[in-house]
């Protein structure tokens, strides 16, 4: 039991290191979109085909510190290797100065032997100079 716990801790630490590396490689958001003054993302995650176990929150981006990386973890605790990377869609929309845009993406993770069935829907609002 202790070995399994230790393995989980090491996996978590490795994921954090990988996340920092991806953030560093992405650069800063204000460098990619210099005239951006605010960004908020309304995130709504559901199971495909249903409304059970919904997750809904608003992510307000702190521009001074934000990497040009938009990854969201899957909220299903059983999901392995899942989550959503909406970086390209959001950066593309911000670079073209869109004030409001939305999108969705299915989780690519697995819950045991089956595919994760969660879907992320997001609405982003942005302001520019």
Where would I find each of the regions flagged by the language model?
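Short, intrinsically disordered terminal segments enriched in charged and Pro/Gly residues
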Residues: 1-68, 121-129
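Short recognition patches in nucleic-acid-associated and regulatory proteins
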Residues: 39-63, 68-110, 117
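Terminal low-complexity interaction tails
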Residues: 107-129
């Amino acid at each position: 039991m202790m070995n399994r716990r230790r393995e989980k801790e090491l996996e978590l630490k490795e994921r954090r290191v990988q996340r920092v590396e991806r953030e560093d490689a992405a650069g800063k958001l204000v460098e990619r979109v210099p005239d951006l003054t605010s960004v908020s993302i309304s995130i709504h995650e559901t199971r495909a085909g249903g409304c059970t176990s919904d997750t809904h929150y608003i992510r307000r981006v702190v521009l001074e510190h934000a990497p040009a990386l938009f990854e969201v973890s899957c909220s299903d605790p059983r999901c392995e290797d899942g989550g959503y990377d909406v970086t390209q869609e959001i950066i593309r929309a911000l670079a073209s100065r869109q004030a409001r845009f939305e999108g969705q993406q299915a989780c690519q993770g697995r819950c045991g032997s089956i595919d994760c069935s969660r879907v992320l829907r997001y609405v982003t609002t942005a302001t520019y100079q």
